[in-house]
Amino acid sequence: MCGSDDSFDDFVPDSQEPASSRTRNQDHLDDDEVPCSQRPDAANDTMVEDLDEGDEPAHDESEDIIKILVATDIHCGYGENKANIHMDAVNTFEEVLQIATEQKVDMILLGGDLFHENNPSREVQHRVTQLLRQYCLNGNPIALEFLSDASVNFNQSVFGHVNYYDQNLNVGLPIFTIHGNHDDLSGKGLTALDLLHESGLVNLFGKHSNIQEFIVSPILLRKGETRLALYGIGSQRDDRLVRAFKNNSISFLRPNAGAEDWFNLFVLHQNRPRRAMHRSTGNFLPESLIPQFFDLLIWGHEHECKPDPQYVASSEAVGDGFYILQPGSTVATSLTPEEALQKNAFLIKIKGRKFASKPIPLQTVRPMVCDELLLDKIPPGSRPILKTDRPKHTDGRYIDEIAIEAKINEMITTAKAKRRPRQPELPLIRLKVIYDGDWLNITPANAKRIGLRYENVVANAVDMVFIKKNNKPKEGKLQTENEKNITEMADEMGQVSATNLQTIINDYFINQPLVDQMTVLKPIGIGRALEQYSAIEEGGLATSANRNFDSCLMHQIDVVRKTLKKMPLPPINDPSDLDKFRDLITKDLYDMKKADSERFKNPVADVEMEEDEDDPQYYMPPQSTSRTNYASGSEDEVANSDEEMGSSISRHSKQPTTRGRGRGARGAGASRETTRGRSNKVVSTRQIDSDGFEIINDSPSPPPASRSTRGKARGKSAPSKKRDLSFF
């Protein structure tokens, strides 16, 4: 939406941009600009290595260049209960703010997960607020013009303007951020970021309360001749967002006139690689679903830093591709090789339709070294006589512990050699010890006992050593399907994620004999519970997870009771009829299990099964005070999910009306529907709304809705009164 003070009349009419206007600039390069090794030789490439247009520019180049400092997954509050690392995330966040000040950027863009928890501790909120006030509130001039309708971009707020347009605040460094899966919505749809937004310290955008339809309105910014359209979608469940793209229920608004003059930047917080092997959506967002008009994507949630923007070619005969920048986290929240890579913030310069990217190494990140040690040979003469004995050296020390400690000392030496002056002194060490060959039948060493010997040398002594036995199936014994799944889904550190474990749980219960399958509790509920319990950090409490699981279980019991009440009540005239009634209830429960089993086993119903996860009878609410990796639903979504599931078929069959997003109709509370999704062909549709924005859809139309006859009355018997099952 355009602000009332701005006009698009002077813009070039919307047309296909000539290829020559987006060719890569071949002028002289700055030494500090890192070239993109994956940049294609495309005629309409937007990434350049230098934004200078010549030796004698007509005016100061800074008047047209938008400078943005990008960082994602800061996780303030991570490890606050651990002695050595409790301030790591906050200290690095301060470094990000310092870099922004030194580089004199126009704005900071955060890609989600500023906080590690939805409800961070008071100490963490206090420290973050201090830093934001210290670095963001000052008298520095801001050259960015805010052109869009702030009441639409920040519709969750009562303040209808960007924070640096507030006359009561003196903002010198604006921050724009979306929410991630750690600081996501819960309860009444609020997060800790909402407090920072309402206090004027950050600008929170990309919140979407309507999970049936996503309408993404960009933040429009201008500096000199450069126009930036900033799009954002806060963290959503990947299955839900993929369905939105495939069902054509997500729209990105664009300026009607001069749309090709805007640099389109999209920030999101989703799984990028496939995280589940046995699901149709894979628990990730495929890059192929993203519209092609974007120039650059900032991809949050993935902690591995990829310093070079990666080009994604267009899948269409006509159309440009886009670049994806994956900044990675600024703090390590897991002990994996990907987290041990160099952490960076990124300086993005935008001029016209071109951009340049430069990684800035972070100097305060705690050093980390990850490695593996394979134990497969026992030295001659050291083999124990009894299986319960462990091989010892002549000096009485255990041979495996000698090898483990030698490897740890080598890793610590490496960490100290690479340590920079501003980095914390104690490093993070993760050694994966694999017992194989001669060591398979030997009792492994005690990992924690070894770690405690390094308590004052490393930051993570307790979980420094990870021990794994490379067990193989016995001869003549076939590996079960679930064992194969666990082996395939285990990551490089030998651990299985909660999301993949959900798939294993589903497969196990679905493949059980029908009589042994569960009636009330659903596998999805168990998987969600395990996900929350696994997210509890060491020393944390499981109170919230216990409460959520109890609530889920009681709700599922209530669903079964209500379903049984809807079934016909037979006549009861004598005591023998009570036995028949009891048998009928048993049969009803069996029929319910059978219907569920057939539906979940049917491969073509895979999408329906994913949609069922939004249903309260399957739903496990997210834990609001601990880390949740992939679930991002809220309690409000639980309350409304029955209505959403019931309306998922009729919403496409209703006679559509115009959307009515005009400025005069805002806040009127009128329902709005669109004509999206009514074509059976994969097309790119365009519409113009009353504010001069262009609605685009580059996603395929939804498949026809399936219908189920489950729950209808048996035979042709006349309807009877509902059962009274208050005793159930």
UniProtKB/Swiss-Prot annotation:
Annotated residues for binding of Mn(2+) 2: D113, N181, H269, H301
Keyword DNA damage (UniProt): yes
Location in or out of the cell: Nucleus; Chromosome
Domain of life: Eukaryota
Keywords: Chromosome, DNA damage, DNA repair, Endonuclease, Exonuclease, Hydrolase, Manganese, Meiosis, Metal-binding, Nuclease, Nucleus
Region: Disordered, residue numbers: 1-45, 601-728
Biased composition (Acidic residues): 1-12, 607-616, 634-645
Residues that, per the record, bind Mn(2+) 1: D73, H75, D113, H303
Known partners and oligomeric status: Component of the MRN complex composed of two heterodimers rad-50 and mre-11 associated with a single nbs-1.
Function: Core component of the MRN complex, which plays a central role in double-strand break (DSB) repair, DNA recombination, maintenance of telomere integrity and meiosis. The MRN complex is involved in the repair of DNA double-strand breaks (DSBs) via homologous recombination (HR), an error-free mechanism which primarily occurs during S and G2 phases. The complex (1) mediates the end resection of damaged DNA, which generates proper single-stranded DNA, a key initial steps in HR, and is (2) required for the recruitment of other repair factors and efficient activation of ATM and ATR upon DNA damage.
Name of protein: Double-strand break repair protein mre-11
Taxonomic placement: Eukaryota, Metazoa, Ecdysozoa, Nematoda, Chromadorea
Designated gene of the protein: mre-11
